[in-house]
Regions:
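Conserved ABC ATPase signature
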Residues: 17, 43-47, 51
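Conserved ABC ATPase "signature" region
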Residues: 6, 21-39, 64
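ABC ATPase nucleotide-binding domains
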Residues: 136, 140-182
Length: 182
């Protein structure tokens, strides 16, 4: 099966129907938007993980649903494609689509998402804007780790990182030396 077939509107067709020219055009437009049109005739087995993620997004777009649920859509992508997926999701939301994403890239979520639902301890800890949810106390609680939140001086975006205490770092380094060097 080639990529063009994967990105089409088959879920909406009866078993005896074929895609119309409009369906084919829509699939190609969605592939164009996600930067995968040049892959249309390639077998699915010949594309990278990042290309597969973008092809899956094209497939979702071709379904023309009002709600998109994207479960870790940036997994396995390099930083350029990760940002691209978040940008796509933001553009779709601005066009009136409801976009729900499960993500672990907090810095990108802070930059592109208008609303954040933070889960931790098996429950919903917060539901608000990135500035109100991505605070050190809430994130430290959610991740059971010491989290630092600051502003990037170059673009003023929220920047979220973990803090490593020196005692733990020294202990881990000593253990690693023991594992690797003895």
């Amino acid at each position: 099966m080639c990529i063009r077939d994967r990105a089409g509107r088959y879920p909406y067709l009866k078993w005896w129907e074929r895609e119309s020219e409009d369906d084919k055009r829509l699939a190609l437009d969605c592939m164009e938007y996600t930067g995968t049109r040049e892959l249309a005739d390639k077998p699915v087995t010949e594309v990278s993980g990042g290309q597969k993620q973008r092809i899956l997004l094209a497939k979702v777009l071709a379904q023309q649903t009002p709600v998109l649920f994207l479960d870790e859509p940036t997994t396995g992508l390099d930083m350029v494609y990760q940002e691209e997926i978040f940008r796509f999701a933001r553009e779709l939301a601005l066009m009136g689509k409801t976009v729900l994403m499960v993500v672990h890239e907090l810095n990108l979520a802070a930059k592109y998402c208008g609303r954040i639902l933070l889960l931790g301890e098996g429950k919903l800890l917060a539901d608000d804007t990135p500035e109100r949810v991505f605070t050190e106390p809430l994130l430290s609680r959610a991740y059971a780790a010491d989290i630092a939140v600051s502003r990037n001086p170059l673009n003023n975006n929220l920047e979220i990182t973990t803090r490593v205490d020196e005692a733990s770092k020294e202990k881990e380094t000593a253990l690693l030396k023991k594992i690797c060097c003895e």
